[in-house]
Each structure stands twice: as C-alpha cells, then as structure tokens.
Amino acid sequence: MQRSSLKSKKIKEQEIAVKKAWRSTYKNSYEEGLYFLLQGLNEEEFSLDKVLHQIKNKIPIQYILKKWFFYDGEYILNNHVLIPRPETEVLVNHIIQNFSSCRTILDLGTGSGCIAIEISKKLLNSKITGTDISKRALEIANTNNLQSSNPVNFILSDWFSEIDEC
C-alpha cells in the first residue's frame, strides 16, 4: 500500500474512533454535537485546541460553553454547580401546576439556582428561597437570578441551618 493511502486509512480510523467516543460520551451524533458546540462558542473567542482538549478529557459541553438552557431560561454554569437535566423540568412543571398557592418555597442545594429561578418566574406571589453550602455555587445562582422579575433569595446554608421559617 502506498504511504498516502495508509495515512488516509489511519485518519479515517481515527475519525471513526472520535465519533464513537463522542456518541458514547455526549449521547448524540458527532455532527449534532459539534454543530451545537461551535454555535455556542461562536459567541465568544475560544481556542480550538483548548476545546478539543476538553472534549478529549470528557468535559461536558455545558461546562465548555459555560452556559446551558433550562426550562425558559439560559443559565451560567461552571464545575461548582451541577448541570441542569431535562428531567428536572418535569419537577418544575409539577411544582408550578400543583403548588401555585404556596406562599413560600424552599430549594435546598440550589446550585445554579435554575429550579428556584424558573419557579419564581411563574409563581409571582411566592417567596422563594434557595440554599447551598457552596459560596461559589451561590455566586453563580445570584448572577442567574438577574433574569427573574421575582428574584429568589439565595442563602449560604447547610440545609436548614440558616433558615428562619419554612
């Protein structure tokens, strides 16, 4: 075999391996994921080498992009908060539909604040408090809180330790 065809075959094998690794890690096709990733990164300057290194190290796309959509909002994320899951949107819907008469709602371990914030956007007559033990998580939650007209009160607390009333 000629050297160029061996090189071409090796590149093709590497491409297949990358696509399989992508699908296994991110649970979508390489083309879909890469398109989405590049769309998100297009909004800011980025180093392709750094992004490829992060992908190789199985860093979630949400952390690479530093933001993610959840329910009706876009949330800033980093490795100090968990990534919002689509399944959690079912919980938000359930709370909005079944607990609209509640005057106070408490979100323990709020992380990015996405659950509490999305609920606060719909239940305008409710006072919503989110707690977290991590100062860094609360910094993210407070930044994300700017998108709500019914801001959530975020408190540094180990579960109920700093909660006066519930």
Regions found by a protein language model. Give the residues of each.
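Short N-terminal micro-motifs specific to bacterial/archaeal maturation
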Residues: 24, 28, 79-82, 146
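N-terminal auxiliary segments of SAM/dcSAM-dependent transferases
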Residues: 2-65
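Short loop/helix-cap segments at secondary-structure boundaries that form the rim of catalytic
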Residues: 165-166
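Short, conserved SAM-binding/catalytic segment
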Residues: 141-152
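SAM-dependent Rossmann-like transferase core, predominantly class I methyltransferases
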Residues: 53-123, 128-140, 154-157, 161
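Proline-centered flexible-loop/turn and helix-kink motifs
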Residues: 23-27, 124, 150
